């Protein structure tokens, strides 16, 4: 029948299966996402709710495991997309063209058994990947098709065909497969010849809520695109959605749930040997893990501080003179320097932090990296006459953003509105009452918005303001505005760390000069178009995947 199939994909489904809701599209999605994916398969679950398999493992003697058999199908280790040795033929999808190139199931395995394993090996032989898709769930009433007695009926071919399979693929099995039951962590995802990275952060990156999470998410995407196997440990071990599923569909193993929260040390001890790199984020999270990893791991430790907390808080002290801020800054300084001295490499988003660290200790290995990474770029045609309003974007869980908006509303915006009647849109998660309850004429508090709505605002507003009075390092909101080609007016703190930004954005610190600059550029269409064009050229040059990878690849390779 399959010889007459006209569709792009062939689907094989046993007669003893029951498909679950929304089972088909996830299989198609994997095929369409990557042209090198040749075959995909479903998560198979028994009728009693236990897992039958999350992909299959073949050992070097041709014996096989249904990975995860009789485990909880909702456990995190069974819910990420990954390469797999084979997929049980109860529910598999293959490219029709590839199926015909291979010639279908090898007839030496007629009438049953090992034909699915052999097909997976043929798919790889032809240059394609075999993937497991956990979002496609199929109940398999195993045994109904061929029974369970290996001495009778078609079931008797199971042992016989395993011997045939071993003879056909002996060299491949001995070269690329593990002895039975060994190194399951690697075997389950065909990870023998891949580098593995454990990424630790405060929680699964909620990239539409704060700049730090967006940075983490972008770096995860880049590392996956470079072929690394990623395990992600969020310190709260919570399954935030839709963010967790998005990582899992990228092929990232996310640790979540009580099993890992209560036993993370035991899990790390058991699997520490498999990680080539430990990529740790933020000082208050890293301090919990770095000593344990340093003591027991062989892999390299890379620490990304996101910003220098002690520098940011010291600047806040310089602004308000509160003694407790000075004390807090000193505590952060002690902790951050301790972490940096334990790490093999330290990342910060600008030369400002690198210089500040080396002024304290020139021996600390530190590198200025690019905070944001873009795979694709927009071609923005900036039309001032179709835009209106001034936009601020920043999460209010970060104190400098709250201070910036309050200062702008108090000292800058009243005169701006009086002169140009431009509405002020405030976007950011975790907005406190003093922001959400604002009733000032012209001020529109949007609070948290989706990525789609944020993009609409970037495409409809005329100007972005970043009126930060303190902070440290490169500001993600500035980079994002550059990406969307929307002109920026900012302070020197907002512009910090972005080399050459003064040739693109308008930078002013003094209140009246900032007011004048906003009013002037807002009404100058020619200048707005010029800034937009320069912004897009700049971000393409500095923030592409290739540009970022050139900076960090030596640390990961």
Give residue ranges: language-model regions.
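Conserved donor NDP-sugar-binding/catalytic core segment of glycosyltransferases
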Residues: 17-59
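A short, conserved alpha-helix in the catalytic core of glycosyltransferases
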Residues: 22-28, 83-103, 108-139
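Short, flexible, basic/aromatic active-site loop/helix in glycosyltransferases
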Residues: 42, 59-85, 100
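Conserved catalytic-core segment of nucleotide-activated headgroup transferases in glycan assembly
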Residues: 208, 212-217, 221, 232, ...
């Amino acid at each position: 029948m399959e010889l007459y199939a006209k569709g792009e994909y062939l689907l094989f489904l046993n007669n003893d299966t029951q498909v679950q809701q929304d089972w088909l599209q996830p299989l198609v999605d994997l095929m369409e996402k990557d042209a090198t994916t040749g075959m995909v398969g479903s998560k198979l679950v028994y009728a009693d709710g236990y897992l039958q398999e999350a992909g299959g493992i073949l050992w070097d003697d041709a014996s096989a495991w249904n990975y995860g058999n009789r485990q909880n199908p909702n456990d995190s280790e069974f819910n990420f997309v990954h390469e797999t040795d084979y997929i049980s033929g109860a529910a598999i999808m293959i490219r029709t063209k590839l199926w015909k190139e291979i010639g279908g199931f090898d007839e030496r395995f007629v009438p049953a058994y090992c034909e699915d394993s052999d097909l997976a090996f043929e798919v790889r032989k032809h240059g394609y990947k075999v993937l497991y898709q956990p979002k496609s769930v199929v109940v398999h009433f195993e045994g109904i098709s061929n029974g369970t007695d290996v001495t009778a009926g078609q079931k008797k071919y199971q042992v016989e065909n395993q011997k045939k399979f071993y003879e056909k693929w002996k060299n491949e099995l001995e070269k690329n497969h593990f002895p039975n039951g060994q190194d399951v962590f690697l075997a389950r995802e065909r990870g023998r010849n891949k580098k593995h990275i454990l990424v630790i952060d405060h929680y699964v990156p909620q990239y539409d809520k704060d700049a730090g999470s967006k940075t983490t998410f972008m770096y995860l995407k880049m590392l996956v695109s470079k072929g690394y196997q990623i395990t992600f440990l969020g310190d709260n071990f919570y399954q935030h959605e839709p963010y967790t599923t998005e990582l899992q569909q990228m092929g990232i193993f996310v640790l979540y749930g009580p099993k890992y929260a209560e036993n993370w040390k035991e899990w790390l001890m058991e699997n520490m040997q498999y990680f080539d790199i430990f990529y740790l984020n933020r000082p208050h999270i890293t301090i919990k893990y770095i000593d344990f990893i340093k003591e027991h791991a062989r892999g390299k430790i890379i620490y990304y501080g996101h910003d220098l907390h002690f520098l940011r808080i010291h600047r806040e002290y310089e602004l308000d003179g509160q003694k407790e801020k000075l004390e807090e800054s000193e505590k952060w300084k002690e902790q951050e320097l301790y972490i940096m001295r334990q790490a093999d490499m330290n990342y910060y988003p600008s030369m400002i932090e690198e210089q500040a660290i080396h002024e304290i200790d020139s021996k600390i290995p530190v590198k200025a990296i690019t905070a944001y990474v873009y795979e694709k770029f927009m071609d923005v045609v900036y039309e001032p006459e179709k835009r209106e309003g001034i936009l601020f974007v920043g999460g209010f869980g970060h104190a400098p953003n709250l201070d910036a908006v309050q200062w702008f509303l108090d000292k800058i915006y009243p005169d701006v509105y009086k002169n140009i009647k431009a509405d002020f849109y405030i976007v950011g998660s975790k907005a406190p009452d003093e922001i959400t309850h604002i009733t000032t004429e012209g001020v529109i508090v949007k609070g948290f918005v989706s990525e789609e709505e944020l993009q609409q605002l970037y495409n409809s507003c005329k100007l972005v303001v970043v009126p930060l009075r303190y902070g440290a390092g490169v500001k993600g909101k500035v980079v994002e505005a550059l990406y969307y080609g929307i002109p920026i007016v900012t302070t020197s703190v907002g512009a910090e760390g972005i080399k050459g930004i003064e040739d693109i954005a308008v930078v002013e610190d003094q209140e009246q000069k900032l007011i004048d600059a906003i009013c002037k550029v807002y009404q100058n269409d020619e200048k707005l178009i010029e800034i937009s064009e320069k912004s897009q050229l700049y971000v393409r040059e500095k923030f592409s995947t290739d540009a970022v990878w050139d900076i960090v690849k030596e640390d990961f390779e």
